[in-house]
Amino acid sequence: MANSSPVYDWFQERLEIQDIADDIGTKYVPPHVNIFYCLGGITLVCFLIQFATGFAMTFYYKPTVAEAYTSVQYLMTDVSFGWLIRSVHRWSASMMVLMLILHVFRVYLTGGFKRPRELTWVTGVTMAVITVSFGVTGYSLPWDQVGYWAVKIVSGVPAAIPVVGDFMVELLRGGESVGQATLTRFYSLHTFVMPWLLAVFMLMHFLMIRKQGISGPL
């Protein structure tokens, strides 16, 4: 590049950043692509909003059965723009699920799951399961009446599974009944385990799309 800066030259010599930029900037976009092919990208934007607003709320949320509800109340009433942060988190969560469902329908109806993109489809379905699990775990965190009974019902569902059902229920709840251990587990899953899992599968998903390209029309 003509008249490049010393900083640019330093990075170019070591990382060949111009080649990366050229590859990204010259990627061919098929002519059949329309607005419905943006649904996956919108889902990603919603996830980034979720990450940012969720991270902000961790500064005030207290994951204990005695203080969870009051900490959410404090966030909503006393923290500057706390009500807005939590509201955006809730709205974006609903939007993320909606965009994900529409994205799955678009991929299925256009045959994007067929060979050679089977693994891309598998990673996408895995991310859909994780996203729904986000909703289940996050619903319980305020630890109000709705959240408490929701987690009690959801954590009791595996009891119907033969042999390992009772073990899975106790693993989810952290004991025989719903309590502090349950809230701690759901908080850990919601704020640490699931975000990392989703990020890993997103990376795999995007790399496969990058390698194989966008599927063609039916």
Swiss-Prot record:
SUPFAM superfamilies: Transmembrane di-heme cytochromes. Coiled coil: none annotated. One of its GO terms (molecular function) is electron transporter, transferring electrons within cytochrome b6/f complex of photosystem II activity. Binds 2 heme b groups non-covalently with two histidine residues as axial ligands. Binds one heme group covalently by a single cysteine link with no axial amino acid ligand. This heme was named heme ci. GO terms for cellular component: plasma membrane-derived thylakoid membrane. The chain crosses the membrane at residues 35-55, 93-113, 119-139, 189-209. Heme b 1 binds at residues 103, 205. InterPro entries: Cyt_b/b6_N, Cyt_B6_PetB, Cytb/b6-like_sf, Cytochrome_b_N_euk/bac, Di-haem_cyt_TM. Its cofactor is heme b; heme c. Its main location: membrane. One of its GO terms (biological process) is photosynthesis. It is a multi-pass membrane protein. Pfam families: Cytochrome_B. Heme b 2 binds at residues 89, 190. It is found in: Cellular thylakoid membrane. Component of the cytochrome b6-f complex, which mediates electron transfer between photosystem II (PSII) and photosystem I (PSI), cyclic electron flow around PSI, and state transitions. Heme 1 (or BH or b566) is high-potential and absorbs at about 566 nm, and heme 2 (or BL or b562) is low-potential and absorbs at about 562 nm. The 4 large subunits of the cytochrome b6-f complex are cytochrome b6, subunit IV (17 kDa polypeptide, PetD), cytochrome f and the Rieske protein, while the 4 small subunits are PetG, PetL, PetM and PetN. The complex functions as a dimer. Belongs to the cytochrome b family. PetB subfamily. This is Cytochrome b6. The lineage of its organism: Bacteria, Bacillati, Cyanobacteriota, Cyanophyceae, Synechococcales. The gene is petB.
